[in-house]
UniProtKB/Swiss-Prot annotation:
SUPFAM superfamilies linked to this entry: CAD & PB1 domains
Gene from which the chain derives: IAA19
Protein name per its UniProtKB record: Auxin-responsive protein IAA19
Motif annotated as EAR-like (transcriptional repression), chain positions: 40-44
Described function: Aux/IAA proteins are short-lived transcriptional factors that function as repressors of early auxin response genes at low auxin concentrations.
Family: Belongs to the Aux/IAA family.
Residue ranges, compositional bias (Low complexity): 114-126
Length: 281
């Protein structure tokens, strides 16, 4: 007779007594905590008892969440998010340190420049204040010395030369001569004849005065009518006079303009010596 059939648990529905006892022991604290959390208590709104806080902590630890992993404990490895947070914190700290260092350096530079400015001589009111003040002071000093040198050169040039304009009746242009380069009226007359040689023509053969004396011959008032051109000048008083009435040195200081005019137009003009002689008569 075959042996009786025994019921076998192939799926594992029936747990062993040891496993069931262990599972019951493991689930008992959680059930107790959950029951304590759900229990009704008397208290003010919003207040929490220590037992409820502990229960919430246990429930949170036992629950599964989809958020970021909690920070590592002990010697566990760091997560990706944690490493990023720490790197950003280090960068922020380094940036703050660099900013503080730059501010300190700027303060030290300003302090040093302020001490240099306090030790430097005070600039004049007319000088332009720049930065740094030492360079602007040197620039203003060089500009003042250059202006002074330029003024001295101009003064020397004005003292060393005496330029006057020369015009001629019928000539379409003007010339300018330096009276300091000539030593007498004769030299000036020759130079002007060379300048305006194309406009000055020979006089009539009846007049035998030399070519040199043609522009400056003012010794006789009657001779002006016979001369084709006569040299006149404008003095400081804006009066037109015949050349030759003053000594050469005095003439160079009083002459402002020269004009070679026709003898017929200068018939009413005479040197000052002849005018004074006529008044005395």
């Amino acid at each position: 007779m075959p042996p009786p059939l025994e019921a076998r648990d192939y799926i594992g529905l029936a747990a062993s007594p040891a496993s069931s006892s262990s599972s019951c022991c493991a689930s008992t604290p959680v059930a107790e905590v959950v029951g304590a959390h759900l229990a009704l208590r008397l208290g003010l709104p919003g207040s929490e008892s220590p037992a409820r806080a502990e229960a919430e902590a246990v429930v949170v630890d036992a629950a599964l969440t989809l958020g970021p992993a909690p920070p590592p404990r002990g010697g566990a490895k760091r997560g990706f998010v944690d490493s990023l947070d720490r790197s950003e914190g280090r960068r922020a700290a380094a940036t703050a340190g660099d900013d503080e260092r730059g501010v300190r350096e700027e303060e030290e530079e300003e302090k040093g420049l302020g001490e240099a400015a306090a030790g430097a001589p005070r600039a004049a009111k007319a000088q332009v204040v720049g930065w740094p003040p030492v360079r602007s002071y040197r620039k203003n000093t060089l500009a003042a010395s250059a202006t002074k040198t330029k003024g001295e050169d101009q003064g020397k040039s004005e003292v060393g030369c005496c330029y006057v304009k020369v015009s001629m009746d019928g000539a379409p242009y003007l010339r300018k001569v330096d009276l300091k380069t000539y030593s007498s009226y004769e030299d000036l007359s020759l130079a002007l004849e060379k300048m305006f040689s194309c406009f000055i023509t020979g006089r009539s053969s009846s007049h035998k005065t030399s070519k040199r004396d043609r522009l400056t011959d003012g010794s006789r008032a009657d001779a002006l009518k016979d001369q084709e051109y006569v040299l006149t000048y404008e003095d400081k008083d804006a009066d037109w006079m015949l050349v030759g009435d003053l000594p050469w040195d005095l003439f160079t200081t009083s002459c402002r303009k020269l004009r070679i005019m026709r003898g017929s137009d200068a018939a009413g003009m005479a040197p000052r010596s002849l005018e004074q002689t006529g008044q005395n008569k």
